[in-house]
């Protein structure tokens, strides 16, 4: 339960208590239950239509929030995962492969968090090593060779900052991806589905179209990290989250992303299938918008998009 959901938790408890009493004592409490359920619906809408940035940060970090592998079966047909960077090893924190979107062959790449403690250890909490980014680039170059559009799912706190990752060239692997992705001659469409953290997110995020789920975040540093650096107090993370403008609607207003995809009431985890279908619809629309461009124009469109981010007129 998240902090801002406490009122909902209390109403749900009352509903469960009444249902239990109704069954146990054979009394009719349906009218009271109906009233509480109506109250729960009203309160849920009220809370989720007035979320603060820190509330959205908490939703983006939920363990039960859908991951890349949760979405893929609903969006792509006949997905086949491909493994390894052909240099060191396969990184489970970065998955990728080939599938079909409405009958068209595409390449799919995404960061992958774990679903429980054991899985998170295996997936390194979605924080990829250099070999993860090199695997992603290998699949992107393969997609370019065979003229397959690329779809990437961003869902990471950041690239793994451990000693072994640094020794194997973490910064170099991300930098190389930025350079190579900027010039790919096939459409690239990216979506932030949870946390989009720093260079770890950008390593698969240089796309013609960048989308975000409405309760996802995209930032150069976590709110806790920013608060610790700026004010020497990580407890001020809530203030940092508001100041940093890291939520989807703020980032759309800044011109950094192209579109925000709505989530079911309560978050994407409340209805994965509905959320996946919304993502699929957005993917198809964005891909259609790029169909008229030549291969060179696609690469130039992407380059200019990122070249113009942050520009302003005095």
From Swiss-Prot:
PANTHER family: ACETYL-COENZYME A CARBOXYLASE CARBOXYL TRANSFERASE SUBUNIT ALPHA, ACETYL-COENZYME A CARBOXYLASE CARBOXYL TRANSFERASE SUBUNIT ALPHA, CHLOROPLASTIC. This is Acetyl-coenzyme A carboxylase carboxyl transferase subunit alpha. Belongs to the AccA family. Component of the acetyl coenzyme A carboxylase (ACC) complex. First, biotin carboxylase catalyzes the carboxylation of biotin on its carrier protein (BCCP) and then the CO(2) group is transferred by the carboxyltransferase to acetyl-CoA to form malonyl-CoA. Pfam families: ACCA (PF03255). InterPro entries: Acetyl_CoA_COase_a_su (IPR001095), ClpP/crotonase-like_dom_sf (IPR029045), COA_CT_C (IPR011763). Keywords: ATP-binding, Cytoplasm, Fatty acid biosynthesis, Fatty acid metabolism, Lipid biosynthesis, Lipid metabolism, Nucleotide-binding, Transferase. The keyword Lipid biosynthesis applies. The keyword Cytoplasm applies. GO terms for cellular component: acetyl-CoA carboxylase complex. Residues 32-289 form the CoA carboxyltransferase C-terminal domain. The gene is accA. Disulfide bonds: none annotated. Its EC number is 2.1.3.15. Pathway: Lipid metabolism; malonyl-CoA biosynthesis; malonyl-CoA from acetyl-CoA: step 1/1. It catalyses: N(6)-carboxybiotinyl-L-lysyl-[protein] + acetyl-CoA = N(6)-biotinyl-L-lysyl-[protein] + malonyl-CoA. HAMAP family: AcetylCoA_CT_alpha. Its main location: cytoplasm. It is found in: Cytoplasm. GO terms for molecular function: acetyl-CoA carboxylase activity; ATP binding; carboxyl- or carbamoyltransferase activity. GO terms for biological process: fatty acid biosynthetic process; malonyl-CoA biosynthetic process. Acetyl-CoA carboxylase is a heterohexamer composed of biotin carboxyl carrier protein (AccB), biotin carboxylase (AccC) and two subunits each of ACCase subunit alpha (AccA) and ACCase subunit beta (AccD).
């Amino acid at each position: 339960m998240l902090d801002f959901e406490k009122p909902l938790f209390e109403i749900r408890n009352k509903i469960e208590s009444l249902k239990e009493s109704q069954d146990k004592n054979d009394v009719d409490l349906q009218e009271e239950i109906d009233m509480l359920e109506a109250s729960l619906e009203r309160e849920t809408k009220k809370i989720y239509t007035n979320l603060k940035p820190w509330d959205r940060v908490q939703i983006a970090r939920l363990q039960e929030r859908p991951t890349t592998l949760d979405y893929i079966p609903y969006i792509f047909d006949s997905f086949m995962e491909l493994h390894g960077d052909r240099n060191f090893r396969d990184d489970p924190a970065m998955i990728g492969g080939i599938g079909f979107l409405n009958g068209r062959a595409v390449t799919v790449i995404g960061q992958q968090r774990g679903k429980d403690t054991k899985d998170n250890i295996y997936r390194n909490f979605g924080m990829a090593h250099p070999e993860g980014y090199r695997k992603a680039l290998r699949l992107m170059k393969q997609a370019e060779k065979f003229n397959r559009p690329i779809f990437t799912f961003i869902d990471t706190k950041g690239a793994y900052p451990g000693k072994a990752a640094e020794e194997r060239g973490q910064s170099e692997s991300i930098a190389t991806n930025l350079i190579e992705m900027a010039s790919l001659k096939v459409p690239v469409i990216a979506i932030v589905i949870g946390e989009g953290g720093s260079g770890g997110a950008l390593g698969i995020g240089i796309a013609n179209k960048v989308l975000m789920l409405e309760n996802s975040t995209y930032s150069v540093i976590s709110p806790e990290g920013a608060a610790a650096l700026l004010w020497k107090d990580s407890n001020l993370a809530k203030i940092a989250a508001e100041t940093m403008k890291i939520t989807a609607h703020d980032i759309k207003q800044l011109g950094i992303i192209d579109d925000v995809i709505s989530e079911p009431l309560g978050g994407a985890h409340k209805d994965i299938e509905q959320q996946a279908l919304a993502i699929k619809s957005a993917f198809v629309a964005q891909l259609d918008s790029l169909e008229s461009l030549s291969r060179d124009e696609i690469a130039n469109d992407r380059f200019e998009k990122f070249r113009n981010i942050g520009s302003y007129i005095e």
